[in-house]
Amino acid sequence: MSTRKPHRLACRLKSVVASTVLLLAGAVAAPTTAHAAPANHYYIQIGGTGAAAEAPGCTTSFEAANRQLNGGIAIPVCYVASGGPFVGSHNEQPAPFAPSFGDSVNQGYWNAKAALENAYRADPTATFTIAGYSQGAWVGDLLLQTIANNGTEVPRDRVDGMLYSDPMQPGTGFWRLVPQGVLVPFVAYSPGTGPEVFPGVPVQRHCIKTDGVCDATSLNSFPGFLQQHPRYFREGEIIASTLARHGGSGTVWYPAA
């Protein structure tokens, strides 16, 4: 009987086995594909009047929120956060030599812009949220307008905004009552109202009904300011529960408590 066919079959089996071994060895030896780490996300945080703190904390307005950033990185902005000639969270304490709102906002704007651009230079793949509360929202509104107009080093598609109790809120904010450029003595020149939309930059405003800073629309706005305005930054309240959900647009309204 001929043994040629079994011999050929054995050779083929050896060839298949050898090829399989080589393929498996190659798969083991091949380096795994590297996965790029996700880009960092930074929160440029601009606090409200009377909330200034020593560096590096700079402001107390975002302390509760910073415990819930889900891996985000807080960059608090140091500035005087003053409202001379009165200071305090409700501007209830006379302070004739304290910087005015206008001077304080000007300092906050330039410090916030520098903080944003410095962070971008150090981490050019990062994304950013401009977060401002009260006077800090005024600062943030101005800075976001600059970003939307391509006036910073940071591409505007890397940035969004979260503004809490923005006095420049269009249609309802305090500054809609004073024409742009008009001086309110000892306070500031009116910045007027902010835009409804910041081109290329998603910005979401948050306002409690009757808070006279962002809802200056009725006689209830002054007592409402005293009652509602401190709610934003409290543990479990609006800033802490929403800041990490940045990226939206428009205005979110909350009922007065």
Locate the predicted segments by residue:
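Alpha/beta-hydrolase fold nucleophile elbow
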Residues: R121-Y133
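Secretory targeting and sorting signals
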Residues: M1-A36
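Surface cap/lid and interfacial helix-loop subdomains adjacent to catalytic sites
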Residues: A37-N118, T146-A257
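A short linear-motif detector with a strong N-terminal bias
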Residues: K14, W138-L142, V182-P185
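Gly/Ala-rich beta-loop-alpha elbow adjacent to hydrolase catalytic centers
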Residues: I130-Q145
